[in-house]
Amino acid sequence: MAAKEIIFSDVARSRLVEGVNILANAVKVTLGPKGRNVVLERSFGSPVVTKDGVSVAKEIELSDRVQNIGAQLVKEVASRTSDAAGDGTTTATVLAQAIVREGQKYVAAGLNPLDLKRGIDKAVIAAIEELKKISKPTTTSKEIAQVATISANGEESIGQRIAEAIDRVGKEGVITVEDGKSLDDELDVVEGLQFDRGYLSPYFINDQDKQVAVLDNPFVLLHDRKVSNIRDLLPILEQVAKAGRPLLIIAEDVEGEALATLVVNNIRGILKTVAVKAPGFGDRRKALLEDIAILTGGQVIAEETGLSLEKATLAELGQAKRIEVGKENTTVIDGAGDSKNIEARVKQIRTQIEEATSDYDREKLQERVAKLAGGVAVIKVGGATEIEVKEKKDRVDDALHATRAAVEEGIVPGGGVALIRVKQAISGLKGANADQDAGIKIVLRALEEPLRQIVTNAGEEASVVVAKVAQGTGNFGYNAQTGEYGDLVQSGVLDPTKVTRTALQNASSVAGLLLTTDATVHEAPKDTPAAGQPGGPGAGGPGLDF
């Protein structure tokens, strides 16, 4: 086991704080509409230019081990805020730095760190209660666009794209972000339920231009096993042919004689059919088949449900207005399922989301809700170069998360103003003793810091602006984009309540831990062998020419 070095008390804390400051100073230059870019070196490929706080934080590793511990703790603040709210990472970093900086002064003066932390926690709880009071729900598409624009560093086109996507697929819909292939941003919306399985034979294609198979007003047969014997399918095929409508078969697989017969009947125009594999695997496949059954008003023909292919009737088949089957995707548009059954299914999946333990499971369940309740929108980010697209894509991701947070918990005035109003509301808060009062003061001072940093990045005098904003009430604040004072909600400078709340909670949590730290244990630096010693350059033995 490698030897460890241990550092105690003030020396440990001061070096941890140095690490906090190095990371925070690199991250906080990105805050606000006039924040600066940071260039990140890559070990391969071209450098990345970003204004995304968490992207900057994740790149930072310091050579001094103790400083690096401090930096990693603040990196944790940014990462946790990003995971929970998707935005607000720079605000969280700025708040953490301010709490650590102010707290360090009190600890050095001999105050009890544990009481300081209790005071900090008390002030943060009160601040969050006040935040909830001034929060208001997002109701309009315009407000959603404004939140997205602020999060995307003032780029209105991104805000409009995201608002349009939410309009099209609903608040439950899935919105994904991809690299585009043109200079402009594009929005693609898939209405209905889409899954990632295509036709099993290209002979099913009936739209040669688009290379897809289109079925109008089809029946949908859902089966959880392989189909290889055509005799199993004949009874239901005859019933569908009599009805004079096309048929989509979704099964574990369709192969051999069964697939060949379907293709021949399709080519001859006897019965228009398309066969596709069922999406997913294992239990997830069963769940997805059940989703499609509920959406189309059919049943999954399976041994578990007591149904068999040979005895299947039209009553057990699903129906839809239109189905498009491509090489890799199948889209079911306007399924004939009962809306009450669909709502009940969505409710059931939402319960599973709340109980899910892994992010992967939660994401897949959320996708299923979206496909049943709304649709899928894809924002394709355009740009002239790969670097530009990557930087813009980061901002679109931030904006998307911010809008989801705004829909979830509402909005507050942006530009650091909400925290100033919170500070005014809790300024009379008292702790159980003088040391706890000092902890409350630390938070009160830290609440000013995001506004101070936004103003500093805009090239103005922070103290003057903070004093003027503090004199105002409600939504009155400083718009760093225009350099003017006014009602920030009216001028569209908004922050999601969830983002501000999460940033404050995470910052105070990690900063409080740092202040109560009294020792660090880390790997001791390795001694490098001196020249001429064994293992070093010039070691004994025959010389080699290089």
From Swiss-Prot:
Enzyme Commission (EC) number: 5.6.1.7
InterPro entries membership: Chaperonin_Cpn60_CS, Cpn60/GroEL, Cpn60/GroEL/TCP-1, GroEL-like_apical_dom_sf, GROEL-like_equatorial_sf, TCP-1-like_intermed_sf
Membrane-traversing stretches: none
Amino acid composition bias (Gly residues), ranges on this chain: 533-546
Tagged with keyword Nucleotide-binding: yes
Superkingdom field: Bacteria
Record-level GO cellular component terms: cytoplasm
Listed GO biological process terms: protein refolding
Gene3D superfamilies: GroEL, GroEL-like equatorial domain, TCP-1-like chaperonin intermediate domain
Family: Belongs to the chaperonin (HSP60) family.
Known partners and oligomeric status: Forms a cylinder of 14 subunits composed of two heptameric rings stacked back-to-back. Interacts with the co-chaperonin GroES.
Name under which the protein is recorded: Chaperonin GroEL 4
Native source species: Paraburkholderia xenovorans (strain LB400)
Higher taxonomy: Bacteria, Pseudomonadati, Pseudomonadota, Betaproteobacteria, Burkholderiales
Gene from which this protein is expressed: groEL4
